[in-house]
Amino acid sequence: MSQARTLHRLIAPAVEALGFELVGCELFRRGATRILQVFVDKPGGIGLDECAKVSRQISAVLDVEDPIRGRYTLEVSSPGLERPLYTANHYRRFIGNKAKIRLREPREGQRQFRGMIVAVDNEEQVTLQLDNKILKVPLGEIEKANLIADFEG
């Protein structure tokens, strides 16, 4: 199990107890600094004070459990307009929206695709309408995905 998935399982109960959805979390390096980025949301959106409240709750859990070796910075925020997509339910929620995905392994010589989410089946296969074709990808083959903000309507 990846460290991000372990962290997700560890902090989800604390986030949900406050009435928020834990959209996802990512652990990465920015220069010499390790960052734990946590995305939370609720219907109607989430504000700065709520992010601070969630941050304090997550910090308390992480201080007790100590799952990350060494120093790191905790960042808690809303997922934003170009929100990350992690689960089949995230894709289902945003059917009809544009997304960009990066695959773990290349397909037809490329790893990155942009298209409209048109379906997610029961086997968790995501279907994207690309410019000139349909792309069907099992969720497990997607390394990273985000919505694309559409300001043109």
Swiss-Prot record:
Q: Which SUPFAM superfamilies match?
A: YhbC-like, C-terminal domain, YhbC-like, N-terminal domain
Question: Which Pfam families does the record associate with it?
Answer: DUF150_C (PF17384), RimP_N (PF02576)
Any one GO biological process:
ribosomal small subunit assembly
Name the domain of life this protein comes from: Bacteria
Q: Which PANTHER family does this entry report, sorted A to Z?
A: RIBOSOME MATURATION FACTOR RIMP
Q: Which NCBIfam families match?
A: PRK00092.1-1
What does the similarity note say?
Answer: Belongs to the RimP family.
What is the protein name stated in its UniProt record?
Answer: Ribosome maturation factor RimP
Q: What is the lineage of its organism?
A: Bacteria, Pseudomonadati, Pseudomonadota, Gammaproteobacteria, Legionellales
Gene name as annotated:
rimP
